[in-house]
Amino acid sequence: VATSHLAPQESLKLGKFCSQQKVKHIYTHLMWAPEYSLEVGKQFIEDGGMVELTAVTFGGFVHKRKLAECVEAINTLGAKNLVLSSDTGAVRSMIPSEIFRMFSVNLSNAGVSDDDLNTMMKKNPLAMIAE
């Protein structure tokens, strides 16, 4: 279950319910808006969920947040709790594979390890859908 654009408090309630039901769940669009804060992400993880960081939020076509804030989120929340995504595909956005490639290269250049990138881009998404 993904939170989509629910308000943070609704997302946290949904996350707790999903944990009780043993349903995998992910908090989407962390830091897209001020109320989608790192603190909300921490709470969602504590309640058993995963958190998504998107290329659109951190250096995508609208550049809402700085890449350094994404690196800080990775270091704070831990790669084992995160999924990276493009969050693109709309008419006015970049090609998903290209923005995702650029996002991963930029994160690597900013010091995120290859192991962490593989965890967030391959291992965790696979675990969400196949395990």
Each predicted region: which residue ranges?
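Histidine/lysine/aspartate-rich catalytic loop segments that bind and position anionic ligands
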Residues: 28-50
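Structural preference for beta-strand elements that scaffold enzyme active sites
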Residues: 2, 24-26, 48-52, 81-83
